[in-house]
């Protein structure tokens, strides 16, 4: 149910105390006034700590700097019928016992008068003594239609011809997802006066979004310049992803397609799991948010779950986007769920519920190295659209990986290197280890003040001990599990 319909229902069913979490007080007040005029036909009294009651000329300056008087004022009005009392920042005062007692005393009379108190709050501060009286709502940030409408309004006010940006207006609107209306106004006013091109305009908005997201402390915004051309091999996985590249478009929605949930990538270290996350972001042209699971967990009881919920909210507000959860196996293991105080289990439960039920266009990419220690709930169907295994690259894939890295380091002369021979030498090497061997060869040649050659790479390979040789048991166990048919192969 939408926020508007939810609030309308609460106000029409004698809910005495409604607590609205929001970061846009001005917009919330406007929406409530609009709802009253169009649908509810109630009287509204607005209060803030500095001005007291300010919107009714008969009661100006009542209860200035006195939150208890703000509640007592309701009684002085003799409980008028069908009235809303909109109290700003009242969460700061609601834990006062005098305020709590007065609200409880008034609740029965407010219900009889079909009147309500709406508290506008920037954070959750609900006293336990009022939990049975309060209904909590969350005021969402502006949706696509609201942002689009506001941008057209701002363009008109600033005498900017919106047709100049018409081709990119959809992308412009999407870029501002996760912004408040006030932040959009400040941002677009600054950017439009700079006379930027459409492409640079969107890049600047994404930079501002990056700063906004990183204020959460648990999410990191990745600006990537990758595509599937940077990924060697993994053709099955890339084909699967290509078929979903337009999954968040209007055409897909009109076709009746559901929003994809995401993928779990399991594999040996260095096989390209993190690279794929970055490549999807670039290929699909969607922002990439990386979750720092270590910062989710806190020492205070309940704080970890709250941080996870806040992360989910931020990701959904920034949608469509890609959420990258790297090395999820380090945080959620079967052992942790049994040995810790229950925090891991509760955080995992919060995340799994969201993965199963989410409707917003957030594509989740989770990566793991140790599949055998992952809790079975994470592998259950419905959490992710698909689970892929990334094995050590084949001969053909190693050739492609060598080509990609040599083209990156020597874009004009990469063909002079004997890629086929190098690929045969690097059996059991991961993609990351191949790159490291090339870098090692470059360092050695640079030290000798000359260009590096195929022989330098061969020497580096001969001195390199890949993980497959040092961790044979674990890698063999993972490969045996994958080959058994319990997971889809990425190649």
UniProtKB/Swiss-Prot annotation:
<dbReference type="InterPro" id="IPR041569">
    <property type="entry name" value="AAA_lid_3"/>
</dbReference>
<dbReference type="Pfam" id="PF00004">
    <property type="entry name" value="AAA"/>
</dbReference>
<dbReference type="GO" id="GO:0005524">
    <property type="term" value="F:ATP binding"/>
</dbReference>
<dbReference type="InterPro" id="IPR003959">
    <property type="entry name" value="ATPase_AAA_core"/>
</dbReference>
<comment type="similarity">
    <text>Belongs to the AAA ATPase family. Highly divergent.</text>
</comment>
<dbReference type="InterPro" id="IPR003593">
    <property type="entry name" value="AAA+_ATPase"/>
</dbReference>
<feature type="binding site">
    <location>
        <begin position="267"/>
        <end position="274"/>
    </location>
    <ligand>
        <name>ATP</name>
    </ligand>
</feature>
<keyword id="KW-0150">Chloroplast</keyword>
<dbReference type="GO" id="GO:0016887">
    <property type="term" value="F:ATP hydrolysis activity"/>
</dbReference>
<dbReference type="GO" id="GO:0009507">
    <property type="term" value="C:chloroplast"/>
</dbReference>
<dbReference type="InterPro" id="IPR052381">
    <property type="entry name" value="AAA_domain_protein"/>
</dbReference>
<dbReference type="Pfam" id="PF17862">
    <property type="entry name" value="AAA_lid_3"/>
</dbReference>
<protein>
    <recommendedName>
        <fullName>Uncharacterized AAA domain-containing protein ycf46</fullName>
    </recommendedName>
</protein>
<keyword id="KW-0547">Nucleotide-binding</keyword>
<keyword id="KW-0067">ATP-binding</keyword>
<keyword id="KW-0934">Plastid</keyword>
<dbReference type="InterPro" id="IPR027417">
    <property type="entry name" value="P-loop_NTPase"/>
</dbReference>
């Amino acid at each position: 149910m939408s926020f508007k319909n939810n609030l309308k229902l609460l106000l029409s069913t004698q809910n005495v105390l409604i607590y609205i979490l929001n970061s846009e007080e001005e917009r919330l007040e406007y929406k409530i006034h609009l709802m009253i005029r169009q649908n509810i036909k109630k009287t509204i009294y607005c209060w803030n700590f500095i001005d007291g009651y300010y919107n009714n000329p008969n009661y100006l300056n009542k209860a200035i700097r006195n939150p208890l008087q703000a509640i007592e004022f309701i009684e002085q009005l003799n409980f008028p019928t069908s009235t809303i009392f909109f109290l700003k920042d009242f969460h700061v005062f609601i834990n006062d016992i005098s305020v709590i007692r007065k609200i409880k005393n008034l609740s029965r009379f407010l219900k009889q008068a079909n009147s309500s108190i709406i508290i506008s709050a920037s954070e959750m501060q609900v006293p336990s003594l009022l939990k049975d009286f309060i209904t909590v709502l969350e005021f969402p940030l502006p949706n696509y239609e609201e942002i689009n409408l506001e941008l057209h309004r701002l363009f008109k006010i600033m005498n900017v011809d919106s047709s100049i940006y018409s081709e990119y207006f959809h992308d412009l609107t999407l870029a501002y997802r996760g912004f408040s209306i006030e932040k959009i106004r400040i941002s677009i006013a600054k950017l439009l006066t700079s006379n930027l091109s459409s492409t640079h305009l969107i890049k600047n908005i994404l930079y501002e979004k990056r700063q906004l997201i990183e204020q959460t402390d648990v999410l990191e915004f990745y600006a990537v310049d990758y595509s599937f051309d940077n990924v060697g091999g993994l053709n099955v996985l890339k084909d699967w992803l290509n078929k979903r590249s337009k999954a968040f478009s209007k055409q897909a929605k009109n076709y009746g397609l559901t929003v994809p949930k995401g993928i779990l990538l399991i594999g040996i270290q260095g096989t390209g799991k993190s690279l794929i996350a970055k490549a999807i972001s670039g290929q699909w042209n969607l922002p990439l948010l990386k979750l720092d699971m270590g910062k989710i967990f806190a020492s205070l009881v309940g704080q970890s779950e709250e941080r996870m919920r806040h992360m989910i909210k931020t990701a959904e507000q920034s949608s469509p986007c890609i959420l990258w959860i790297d090395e999820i196996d380090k945080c959620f293991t079967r052992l942790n769920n049994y040995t810790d105080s229950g925090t891991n289990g509760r955080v995992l439960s919060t995340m799994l519920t969201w993965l199963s039920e989410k409707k917003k266009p957030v594509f989740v990419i989770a990566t793991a190295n140790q599949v055998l220690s992952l809790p079975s709930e994470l592998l259950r169907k419905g959490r992710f659209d698909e689970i892929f295994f990334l094995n050590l690259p084949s001969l053909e894939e190693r050739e492609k990986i060598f080509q990609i890295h040599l083209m990156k380091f020597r874009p004009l002369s990469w063909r002079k290197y004997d890629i086929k021979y190098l690929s045969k030498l690097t059996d059991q090497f991961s993609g990351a280890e191949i790159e490291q061997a090339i870098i090692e060869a470059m360092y050695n040649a640079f030290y000798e003040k000359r260009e590096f050659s195929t022989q330098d790479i061969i020497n580096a390979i001969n001195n390199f001990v890949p993980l497959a040789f040092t961790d044979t048991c674990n890698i063999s166990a993972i490969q045996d599990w994958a080959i058994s048919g319990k997971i889809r192969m990425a190649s």
